[in-house]
């Protein structure tokens, strides 16, 4: 009797535990796979969390050598504010004062400017050299500097003697000092300089239409004919406005020149 009761109790216990066993044990029940429990909590893996960030490589700055062969050339509106009268040349207030502005605008356009620290017209006066010898006077100083490092551009800045009507441009309610590019054809490699001058002239005109008066290629019959441009294949002379241009007009134009230099020399668009 006792054994029969034990068998009955065991049978009922088995029936009670059977559903639990079917859940806990991964077996085939009624021909259907019992899926394993899947953890839906997110798991962070270092390899997956770190996103690939593209590296932006900055191009090397354009190396520019800046000089002023006619270092005492002046602008009437600017010099008059200082000395009270108009003057075409002044030993203190002159075109060399634009060097800080040029450096500033060029730095904003990934260009590093070295200024040739030489007051050419002052030294010419000391040695009693005539005006027409200005390029010969500065040549050894320029040559020495060019030997120190390679330059992508040698920029000789001048002020034209032309009047306001010729050297000024009105564009979008702002006035700009117009510029002219001068290339000396009195040496065998002038075509290289001319190509860069033409590229720069075209680029500034894209930024501000008609701001460039064009490229003037001159032989010795037209003037100096070389302008020390035989010392570098990327040497350019720029006439920055004229005697009647203002500080504001010059500043706006320098911003345009700096941008054009950046485009032409970084993309090497001179042809």
Residue ranges and their predicted role:
Residues 1-16:
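N-terminal Sec-pathway targeting helices
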Residues 20-65, 73, 86, 271:
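N-terminal, intrinsically disordered, polar/charged segments of Gram-positive cell-envelope systems
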Residues 58-129:
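Active-site histidine-acidic residue metal-binding/catalytic motifs
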Residues 74-76, 123-127, 162-167, 190-192, ...:
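Extracytoplasmic/secreted cell-surface and envelope-processing proteins
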Residues 89-97, 132-136, 187-195, 244-252:
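Soluble non-cytosolic domains of exported or imported proteins
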Residues 141-184:
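Active-site microenvironments of hydrolase-like enzyme catalytic domains
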Residues 191-217:
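Active-site-adjacent substrate-binding region
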Residues 215-271:
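Active-site-adjacent mobile loop/cap segments within catalytic or ligand-binding domains
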